[in-house]
Amino acid sequence: AEWCQPCKMLTPTVEELAGEFEGQVLVGKLNVDDNPNTATNYGIRGIPTLLFIKDGQVVQQLVGVKSKAEIKKVIEETLA
């Protein structure tokens, strides 16, 4: 959401990790205000929310601003 300051704070970290894991992961952003049905379908109740999807299934979810190390750990677990 455009008004979400925590989302804006998290963006540079997510972009850094997208670069580090380029070719291994696909990173996308979704504005919940513009896509409320998608947010509802994934059970998103708070933002920012990071979903980690493997083989079409959500395998991990992080809600709130997280450190680069925390997010990287979940990416590595998801890739394992």
Task: Label every PLM stretch briefly.
Residues 1, 32, 55:
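Active-site loop/turn elements of alpha/beta-hydrolase fold enzymes
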Residues 1-3, 46:
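Short pre-active-site segment immediately N-terminal to redox-active cysteine/selenocysteine motifs
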Residues 4-7, 50:
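The canonical Cys-X-X-Cys-His
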Residues 9-30:
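Conserved helix-turn-beta segment immediately C-terminal to the redox Cys motif
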Residues 24, 35, 59:
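Active-site loop signature of alpha/beta-hydrolase-fold enzymes
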Residues 29-33, 43:
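Structured functional modules or segments
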Residues 36-40:
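Short conserved loop adjoining the S-adenosyl-L-methionine
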Residues 46, 51-80:
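Non-catalytic, surface beta->alpha helical segment in thiol-disulfide oxidoreductase systems
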